[in-house]
């Protein structure tokens, strides 16, 4: 014989135990974790297939320095060539002035949407290649009384269509021809769809569509103070978003040109009004000068007076130029602005010089003073008049060749690929989310519903553990097979004591057999009851195999299936269910002939019988006591398999007739609280439970180290 002993030392560090338990809990639930993660990933894949793709189009525009008006050029020089105000231009691009014209140009206030199944319909149409079907509607109006109605356009074929509403309106139209009926006007320019395809036609307000465009439009400056703006527009239709963005850039350019042209026009109007007045004043000044010369016999000015006169004329010309500049700059800034203050300071300096020159003129003889004054008026008037004529010609050229300050660098183009949804990112995120949620769920379930994880946990609370039965992999592989209706069916070969008598679980049951031999020596009778804390914990498995291993010691054993609701021992042992316990207790069968032999020697069975409506009442009858007395006198051991004590009271009733009671609890399933509650139920009924059998102990992912177990395997040599 060869003995293999596997021993693991108990871990004493509490922190290490907790970490190991958490990791082990996750590893044990790995299939649930992987399944949950796979479901999340599958949902993500389905979403990416059926989600509406969002595309992106972009364009590039440049805002150049002001180049149309010479007056504005001079102002820019006063502003020290400050770069264009990109923030203001961005707001202008997003304004109702620009976007409203785009809505009108492209008829964006009219929406035509293909009718599909909810949620997945549009995605299915894309997968089938039918997402490009369209109807182009350029005109659609309806009375205010019909504003709440839903209009549906149905394609009839041969360039015909039918327009109906949920309010009872119905009309037929032809492509390219206006439809007018009951105040409803529609013009369809093109149809590219199969007959019987339906579309919903909606009319939105211009303001609502402008808001929609603003939500989908992004304008950013490329670099800092470059004056280059990047426009991005997103939407579901690749062609439409390109057309919308091209329209926005075109309308922005046109409004800039229109504004510049309007500016030049206003300046021309101002000059046209001023020129006659200036010419009139010039004529008056010339007449006065000529009259004075004739009166004084053509007086000549000395060189000093002529120099003063030239300086005064030059200063007047500069002051007049500043007047034009001030007229322009006052439209842009207040007097507190640095540029405006610079202009005012320059004017003040010229006026101071002019005052000094006037002082010098005052010191001259009166005749020279008058000649200087009249000559200055004429020459200043001539300069002003010529300036105005030059400005007029410049503005006429500017108005005729206005190009604005905006240049479209890159027209709109739709980027290849899909902007949203990002399939790889969504799938990866779903996998991570599914993994995290499943792990958190496993840990929370383990935290709030921690089952018994060691016999020591029971013994520390004063509960005797009679046996610790490991989970049998052999039994697990040959366990119940479910039929179509979900009812468990068993085969006789599945009884572990017969199919694999050397299994560790059977060795543990043999150890239990030895313990019972001494435990029942002082019992009032040879009747042993096995009950359970809850259902599906392997109680019947323990009971049947215990009966089998005891019968192998040449003792006569009778197993009574007292679970008249769900008992299946007859299927497990390969006997019939005729004349079972319920039939005997109901008086339909004889006690003396109720025991049925099984395929195992010295092992008889009383099956549960037909399912009665009142199992508890039958167990309380005197006939059940007679059955127990009869069985106790004819068998060496009577085993009674009862339902779980927490589910029904049958075990408490049967317990009054037995000498020994053991309770089965399942490892990592039943909690300590459940065991204590079950024992309390028996105490309330005056029944003493000898101890607990801990069933289905399995090697956890963290091993048996947590419990300091010793696992023995003793097999025959292969020689």
Curated annotation (Swiss-Prot):
Q: Name one GO molecular function term.
A: ATP binding
Q: One GO CC term of this entry?
A: plasma membrane
List the transmembrane segments. Answer: 31-51, 424-444
Its annotated pathway reads: Glycan metabolism; exopolysaccharide biosynthesis
Main localization of the protein described in the UniProt heading: membrane
Reactions this protein catalyses:
L-tyrosyl-[protein] + ATP = O-phospho-L-tyrosyl-[protein] + ADP + H(+)
Localization, per the record, is: Cell inner membrane
- Asked whether the keyword Chloroplast is assigned, the reply is no
Q: Which residues carry this modification: Phosphotyrosine?
A: 568, 707, 709-710, 712, 714
Question: Which keywords annotate this record?
Answer: ATP-binding, Cell inner membrane, Cell membrane, Exopolysaccharide synthesis, Kinase, Membrane, Nucleotide-binding, Phosphoprotein, Transferase, Transmembrane, Transmembrane helix, Tyrosine-protein kinase
What does the activity regulation annotation say? Answer: Dephosphorylated and activated by wzb.
> For side Cytoplasmic, which residue ranges?
1-30, 445-719
Listed GO biological process terms: polysaccharide biosynthetic process
Which sequence ranges are listed under topological domain Periplasmic?
52-423
Q: What is its EC number?
A: 2.7.10.-
Enzyme class, first EC level, given as a word: transferase
On modification after translation, the UniProt record reads: Autophosphorylated. Seems to be phosphorylated through a cooperative two-step mechanism. First, Tyr-568 is phosphorylated in an intramolecular reaction that generates a significant increase of protein kinase activity. Then Tyr-707, Tyr-709, Tyr-710, Tyr-712 and Tyr-714 are phosphorylated in an intermolecular Tyr-568-dependent reaction.
User: InterPro entries, from UniProt?
Assistant: AAA_dom (IPR025669), Bact_polysacc_biosynth/exp (IPR050445), GNVR (IPR032807), LPS_length_determ_N_term (IPR003856), P-loop_NTPase (IPR027417), Wzc-like_C (IPR005702)
Q: How does it sit in the membrane?
A: Multi-pass membrane protein
Function noted in UniProt: Required for the extracellular polysaccharide colanic acid synthesis. The autophosphorylated form is inactive. Probably involved in the export of colanic acid from the cell to medium.
* Family affiliation: Belongs to the etk/wzc family.
Protein name as annotated? Tyrosine-protein kinase wzc
Q: What is the native source organism of this protein?
A: Salmonella typhi
Q: Which gene encodes it?
A: wzc
């Amino acid at each position: 014989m060869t003995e293999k002993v596997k021993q693991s030392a108990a871990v004493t560090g509490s922190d290490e135990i907790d970490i190991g338990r958490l990791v082990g809990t996750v590893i044990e639930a790995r299939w649930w974790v992987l399944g949950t993660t796979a479901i999340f990933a599958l949902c993500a894949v389905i979403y990416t297939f059926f989600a509406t793709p969002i595309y992106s189009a972009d364009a590039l525009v440049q805002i150049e320095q002001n180049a149309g008006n010479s007056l504005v050029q001079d102002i820019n020089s006063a502003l020290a060539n400050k770069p264009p105000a990109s923030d203001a231009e961005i707001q202008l691009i997003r304004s109702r002035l620009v976007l409203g014209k785009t809505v009108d140009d492209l008829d964006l206030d009219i929406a035509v949407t293909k009718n599909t199944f909810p949620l997945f319909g549009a995605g299915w149409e894309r997968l089938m290649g039918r997402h490009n079907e369209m109807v182009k509607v350029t005109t659609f109006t309806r009375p205010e009384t019909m504003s709440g109605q839903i209009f549906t356009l149905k394609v009839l074929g041969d360039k015909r269509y039918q327009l109906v509403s949920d309010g009872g309106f119905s009309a037929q139209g032809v492509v390219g021809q206006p439809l007018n009926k009951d105040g409803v006007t529609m013009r369809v320019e093109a149809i590219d769809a199969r007959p019987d395809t339906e579309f919903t036609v909606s009319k939105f307000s211009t303001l609502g569509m402008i808001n929609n465009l603003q939500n989908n439009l992004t304008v950013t400056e490329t670099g800092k103070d470059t004056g280059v703006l990047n426009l991005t527009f997103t939407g579901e239709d690749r062609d439409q978003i390109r057309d919308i963005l091209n329209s926005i850039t075109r309308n922005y350019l046109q409004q800039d040109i229109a504004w510049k042209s309007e500016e030049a026009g206003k300046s021309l109007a101002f000059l046209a009004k001023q020129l006659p007045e200036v010419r009139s004043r010039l004529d008056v000044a010339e007449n006065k000068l000529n009259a004075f010369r004739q009166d004084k016999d053509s007086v000549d000015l000395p060189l000093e007076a002529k120099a003063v006169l030239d300086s005064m004329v030059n200063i007047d010309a500069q002051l007049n130029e500043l007047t034009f500049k001030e007229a322009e700059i006052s439209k842009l800034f207040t007097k507190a602005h640095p540029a405006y203050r610079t202009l005012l300071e320059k004017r003040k300096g010229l006026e101071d010089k002019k005052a000094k020159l006037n002082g010098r003129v005052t010191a001259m003889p009166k005749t020279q003073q008058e000649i200087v004054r009249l000559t200055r008026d004429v020459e200043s008037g001539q300069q002003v008049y010529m300036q105005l004529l030059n400005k007029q010609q410049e503005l006429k050229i500017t108005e005729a060749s206005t190009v604005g300050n905006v240049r479209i660098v890159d027209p709109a183009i739709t980027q290849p690929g899909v902007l949203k949804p990002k399939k790889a990112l969504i799938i990866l995120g779903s996998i991570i989310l599914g993994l995290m949620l499943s792990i958190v769920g496993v840990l929370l379930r383990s935290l709030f519903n921690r089952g018994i994880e060691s016999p020591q946990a029971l013994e520390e609370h004063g509960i005797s553990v009679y046996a610790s039965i490991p989970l049998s992999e052999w039994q697990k592989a040959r366990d119940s097979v479910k039929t179509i209706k979900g009812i468990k069916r068993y085969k006789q070969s599945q009884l572990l004591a017969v199919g694999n008598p050397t299994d560790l679980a059977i060795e543990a049951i043999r150890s239990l057999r030895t313990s019972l031999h001494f435990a029942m020596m002082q019992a009032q009778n040879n009747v042993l009851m096995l009950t359970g804390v809850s259902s599906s914990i392997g109680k019947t498995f323990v009971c049947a195999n215990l009966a089998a291993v005891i019968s192998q010691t040449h003792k006569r054993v009778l197993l009574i299936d007292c679970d008249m609701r769900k008992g299946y021992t007859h299927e497990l042992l390969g006997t019939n269910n005729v004349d079972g316990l319920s039939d005997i207790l109901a008086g339909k069968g004889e006690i003396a002939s109720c025991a049925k032999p099984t395929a195992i020697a010295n092992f008889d069975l009383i099956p549960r019988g037909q399912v009665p409506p009142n199992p508890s009442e039958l167990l309380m009858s005197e006939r059940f006591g007679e059955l127990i007395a009869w069985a106790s006198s004819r068998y060496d051991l009577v085993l009674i398999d009862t339902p779980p004590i927490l589910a029904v009271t049958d075990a408490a009733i049967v317990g009054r007739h037995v000498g020994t009671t053991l309770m089965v609890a399942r490892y990592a399933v039943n909690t300590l609280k459940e065991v204590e509650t079950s024992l309390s139920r028996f105490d309330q009924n005056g029944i003493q439970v000898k101890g607990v059998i801990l069933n289905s102990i399995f090697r956890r992912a963290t091993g048996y180290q947590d419990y300091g177990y010793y696992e023995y395997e003793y097999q025959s040599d292969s020689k």
